[in-house]
């Protein structure tokens, strides 16, 4: 019986696609917590600021996704373009409760959306920290981020909490389906 399951697993793996996703956003947006919550399937409550990048693999549906969580500090954002060519899609994380930095997040997102290396690649925009009282909601953020004018790439915006896997899986499934 074990042989049958091994053969079925091998067969399933032959149909599995592979892709690379960049998880980008400003520092302290929750990128690393999202990465590890997705990978482990449970809440990750404590992370440290990413200096450089983290890479993990996650299987969603029939797609084996290599996720690159790249630091969001100003000095590291300058390195993002080096990863664009190999990316199949982008997950852009925004701290929806950090009202002082939403404009900066919008500017960074628009720079990504207008990058010639990312044109046509799908963008998942994650509005993180929805559990905080002053978090901006989806409809308001679509206006604040001026997303309706972005026509160069397909995008999907989703409210989430980095420590709650269900919304994250839904979002990354959308991304996997549009790669």
Language-model segments: which ranges?
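TRAFAC-class small GTPase G-domain
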Residues: 1-179
């Amino acid at each position: 019986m074990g042989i049958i399951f091994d053969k079925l697993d091998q067969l399933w793996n032959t149909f599995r696609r592979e892709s690379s996703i960049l998880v980008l956003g400003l520092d302290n947006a929750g990128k690393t917590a999202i990465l590890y919550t997705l990978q482990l399937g449970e809440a990750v409550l404590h992370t440290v600021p990413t200096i450089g990048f983290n890479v993990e693999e996650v299987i969603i549906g029939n797609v084996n996704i290599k996720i690159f969580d790249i630091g969001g500090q100003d000095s590291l954002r300058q390195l993002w373009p080096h990863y664009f060519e190999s990316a199949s899609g982008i997950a852009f994380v925004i701290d929806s409760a950090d009202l002082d930095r939403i404009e900066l997040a919008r500017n960074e997102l628009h720079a990504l959306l207008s990058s010639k290396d990312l044109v046509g690649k799908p963008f998942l925009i994650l509005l993180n920290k929805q559990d905080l009282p002053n978090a901006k909601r989806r409809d308001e953020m679509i206006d604040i981020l001026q997303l309706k004018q972005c026509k160069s790439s397909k995008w999907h915006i989703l409210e989430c909490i980095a420590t709650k896997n269900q919304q994250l899986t839904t979002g990354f499934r959308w991304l996997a389906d549009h790669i």
